[in-house]
Amino acid sequence: MEKKKSMFVEQSFPEHEIGDTNKNFDEDGRDKRTGTWMTGSAHIITAVIGSGVLSLAWAIAQLGWVAGPAVLMAFSFITYFTSTMLADCYRSPDPVTGKRNYTYMEVVRSYLGGRKVQLCGLAQYGNLIGITIGYTITASISMVAVKRSNCFHKNGHNVKCATSNTPFMIIFAIIQIILSQIPNFHNLSWLSILAAVMSFCYASIGVGLSIAKAAGGGEHVRTTLTGVTVGIDVSGAEKIWRTFQAIGDIAFAYAYSTVLIEIQDTLKAGPPSENKAMKRASLVGVSTTTFFYMLCGCVGYAAFGNDAPGNFLTGFGFYEPFWLIDFANVCIAVHLIGAYQVFCQPIFQFVESQSAKRWPDNKFITGEYKIHVPCCGDFSINFLRLVWRTSYVVVTAVVAMIFPFFNDFLGLIGAASFWPLTVYFPIEMHIAQKKIPKFSFTWTWLKILSWTCFIVSLVAAAGSVQGLIQSLKDFKPFQAP
């Protein structure tokens, strides 16, 4: 039998020496990178404007008109400031001509080394796993919201319309199993652009509905400078815990430092240099998301007041027009399908690259096979990729089914990852790269910023843990709420 008639054809790819540059390969021997600051911005917007935007009205309600926007702006500034430091560390020791570092861990190894590399890996991959679980929860909530919205429209708003999240988590997992066979970040640009468009759609719909609700008057909506009122809305202890949790939710809403290096590794070599292109992408991405966050958070709070739901599109702050709310929730689900891939690709590539280094001659791990699909063309299949990525998606879906707590889960992820990944490591690497003298003015204020963010992360984590404990008391897994 001729080899070309076989469904599977093993591929053999030539090795390319570092420095072998031509139109198909970069100086490190890898396929030529084609990303620009615009595709980088799309990746960032996909990563940042995620499920976090939906809880911002609730977060502003806990903090009030003064502290709410102030905390949003503070996290925005800190995230952009430290992302510029991280962008300069993609190459080492020189940010323009140095050796490429392909992952966050490699960057930390180049500049800091030692035990900090393991701590970075624990924080980064733990955070990425948590985010993919959180996105599974959120996507299923949005899918359920479509079904419940139609039920309310048909039967009235007083009907319970209880629907289990579990079947929709299974649907989401099946889609992710298929998309997870996309080999790497370099093939994700189209999905990120689609997801970014979806995020603009549902954020705009949420803002529009909030403006219409606030302008329409109706029932009295109570907002205050300090948020929910002790003795009326909550007890003193609840106010403290909710404030901490709201800070964690806002921190989560700016989570993209975990994938910044992987995004930067998709950008083509200059001019402009990768670090300049990444800084521009970060500026556009963070500015755009902050604008939408301010709109969604503040307009949502104006519409719902201190009774703002934890997720203002699925918590049924709105019932009509039901078709528009359905469309917004479909946009959320589509966006999170793409966002899930942005955050899980670094996990996939870490396991696969480590396996290939340890067992380079194992065909199960390193073999690539071409499969011809009628009407669709040829696809490359790797058995490790197929088994490992499928298993990962299934496990995250099962965990999401057991712990479907939206706000508390987001707050805990944000609190646990914000300080080490967004603040501590970028600042420490910047100090090492620029050789900033200890106890100098710059060194001192960078350390003050780092420790301040550490304290904020601690209190936010405490609030989220308390919220999870409260949610677990009456929860029964795999059942409709």
Curated annotation (Swiss-Prot):
Example GO CC term: the record gives:
plasma membrane
Q: In which tissues is it expressed?
A: Expressed in roots and leaves, and at lower levels in stems and flowers. Found in the xylem parenchyma.
Going by the UniProt record, its keywords in alphabetical order are: Amino-acid transport, Cell membrane, Membrane, Symport, Transmembrane, Transmembrane helix, Transport
Q: Which GO terms describe its molecular function?
A: acidic amino acid transmembrane transporter activity; neutral L-amino acid transmembrane transporter activity; symporter activity
- Coarsely, its chief localization is membrane
Q: Where in the cell is it found?
A: Cell membrane
Q: Does the keyword Transmembrane helix apply?
A: yes
Give one GO biological process term. tryptophan transport
Q: What happens when the gene is disrupted?
A: Larger seeds and rosette leaves and increased number of cauline leaves at flowering. Decreased concentration of lysine, phenylalanine, leucine and aspartic acid in the sieve element sap, but no significant effect on aphid feeding behavior or reproduction.
Domain of life per record:
Eukaryota
Query: What's the name of the protein?
Result: Amino acid permease 6
Q: Which family is this protein grouped under?
A: Belongs to the amino acid/polyamine transporter 2 family. Amino acid/auxin permease (AAAP) (TC 2.A.18.2) subfamily.
Functional note: Amino acid-proton symporter. Stereospecific transporter with a broad specificity for tryptophan, proline, and neutral and acidic amino acids. Has an affinity for aspartate in a physiological range. Involved in the uptake of amino acids diffusing out of the xylem tracheids into the xylem parenchyma.
Q: What induces it?
A: Down-regulated by drought and salt stress.
- What does the record say about its membrane topology? Multi-pass membrane protein
Organism, scientific name: Arabidopsis thaliana (Mouse-ear cress)
Q: Which residues lie on this side of the membrane: Cytoplasmic?
A: 1-36, 79-125, 189-190, 264-283, 343-385, 428-447
